[in-house]
Amino acid sequence: AYRVDIKAFSEDFYRKVCGARLQPVLDSAVLARELGMHVEVVTLVIPGQNDSPQETGALIRWIRDNLGEDTPVHFTRFHPDHRMRDRGATPVAVLERIYRQAREEGLRFPYLGNVSPHPWESTYCPSCGALCIERYGYSVIFRELSGESCSRCGERIPYVRAGG
């Protein structure tokens, strides 16, 4: 499995905040997918930095078009710890808007993170809506899952079990 942190979908953000470039990050995710790896994307949503509907929409469409609609994408809540203490935590309503935007744009497995408890931390079958994998903090319960498929309708559910 390959987890890639796409910090923002802006070269300006990468240059100013990360001292890096966005394109190599995107290229590494595409290469991992081309090599047949299970790729998951994580984006820490920072208020006023990378949370606009335009930027999140561009990121979502890039993931769908370059990594595939089945790519799990985790939109995680920012908390003002460590270096960025000049802004508050990401409002849950903003994360919920991004989740809905991801679903509307065709991503089948978006998730919210750092918001426990929240139903959108869990995995739902995109075909029948069954709760396949329930997440609550660090707890994971496999529910309507048979192997790699939804036990209700047979839809493939992409995931990797910890430790293998």
Regions found by a protein language model. Give the residues of each.
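Conserved AdoMet/S-adenosylmethionine-binding subsite of the radical SAM
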Residues: 1-90
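Auxiliary Fe-S-binding modules of radical SAM enzymes
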Residues: 49-164
